[in-house]
Amino acid sequence: VSHLLVNQIISHHTGLHDFGDVENILKERLLSKEINEGDISINKPLLFQEFIDSPFSKSKVEWKHFHHLSRMLFSCLVDADRLDTERFMDVESWRKRGNSATLADLLPQLEAYMQKLQSNAADTKVNRIRQQVKEQCSRTSSSEKGFYSLTVPTGGGKTLSSLLWAMKHAVSHSMNRIIIAIPYTSIIVQTAGLLKEIFGEENVLEHHSNFDPDDIKDEENREKAKLATENWDYPIIVTTNVQLFESMFSNKTSDCRKLHNMANSILVLDEVQMLPTGFLRPIVDALKAYQEMFGVSVLFTTASQPVLSGLIEGTNPKADFKGIEHIKEIIPEEFALHDQLRRVKLSIDDTGKTYDEIAAKVSEYNKVLCIVNTRKDAKELYDRLPNDGVKLHLSRMMCPAHLHDC
């Protein structure tokens, strides 16, 4: 424990050190200066008493998860140090932090929004299924903390229903925030836009490479968002898988600072099948650690759930590892959503085609989506299409602003 706490203290300006380096670093620092007796007084109050008395400290820490505990304590110290300095040096910025709505405050707004959608929706099969999914999410939301999955095909209302489950689950367990991690920035922009429409931009933080807080028109919200990217002190955060998991394994002060605000929160991993298989073992271990030690609930959402429980096979037998022990599916099998929402019939033609042949085939339809393997293929095919009507080229050769305009 002494090494654990010492490492936080000597690292909070430089980045978290490896455990093996702590003793040598400490010796060097102690030998380089004379220590005043007042510096080591034992009459000062125990600053960690609140943490020691908290539920998190009562959980058993496996050795393989010890580095997550180290980072969590490091995060607490770094953020407290930065906020204390900010309160002294820049009190105006300090006053702009926090004061956000709680999830309990925001839940009625979501329920009202979903009720309005339902009232205005036509009585169709798809809308009845969406309502069924919503009601099931609402019914199961008060279940105990843990791992959950929501498997809903495209068009089944997964985005709003998963958010309803997460918010009601959070309110049931007095949890602090919802963190939504998505693999693609294009989906993040759409999701964040919807959430801001429901809750207001002052309650939804976007944190990804394509978002510039300077684009926020309201000055107060703009400054709050800039500050909140440092420590995620918002009720709802929408971010990338990269931002989330790099922070969990980083030793940098800037990355680790936000980690303590992930404790007692809900992680919603959208399109979970896109988790990189090469990093699946440390990701799964991290999620298990955060659930067991820091009171986190995890919701996996997708149309096609990957295998994350039981024995997960690696690239060779030695790389096999134990997944999550129990993931509770929210939607029961008898709902048969995949059968009810099946809207696509696959017809596979494995013969080779030239660009001109594909262009001719595409031109036969009034509305058509053509997906190809590479950006070069997309450009070649686009150039061969006739100019009558509307044709759009979408690829990462375009800048994000132009993609958004399309």
Residue ranges, per PLM feature:
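Conserved strand-helix element at the start of the C-terminal RecA-like helicase core
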Residues: 177-188, 361-386
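SF2 helicase catalytic motif II
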Residues: 241-245, 253-294, 298
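Accessory nucleic-acid engagement/destabilization modules that flank
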Residues: 1-112
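Walker A/P-loop
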Residues: 144-167
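Conserved helicase motor
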Residues: 206-220, 373-376, 391-406
